[in-house]
Amino acid sequence: MTVLTDEQVDAALLDLNDWKHTDGALCRSIKFPTFLAGIDAVCRVAEHAETKDHHPDIDIRYRTVTFILVTHYADGITKKDITMARDIDRLIGD
């Protein structure tokens, strides 16, 4: 799997809702209306990630959930991460 250049990542970010390129990963934090709404979103993303065998790091802080995407075995951001970011946007309704 080929690691994307910073320019390729920045170009992909133009089509992604509120994602940022931070510390060599794609990151997005979402504040949900309730704690359980955030947990529901995490469950939907987790189920989808299992089908794709590509798993985001997920940080839960009360109503704020942060998804972090990086292809660990490639040691960088790949097309799999861009695709998963789009999938997460679709799954959470953004």
Curated annotation (Swiss-Prot):
GO terms for biological process: tetrahydrobiopterin biosynthetic process. The keyword Lyase applies. It catalyses: (4aS,6R)-4a-hydroxy-L-erythro-5,6,7,8-tetrahydrobiopterin = (6R)-L-erythro-6,7-dihydrobiopterin + H2O. InterPro entries: PCD_sf, Pterin_deHydtase. Its EC number is 4.2.1.96. GO terms for molecular function: 4-alpha-hydroxytetrahydrobiopterin dehydratase activity. The keyword Lyase applies. It holds the Pfam family Pterin_4a. Keywords: Lyase. HAMAP family: Pterin_4_alpha. Belongs to the pterin-4-alpha-carbinolamine dehydratase family. This is Putative pterin-4-alpha-carbinolamine dehydratase.
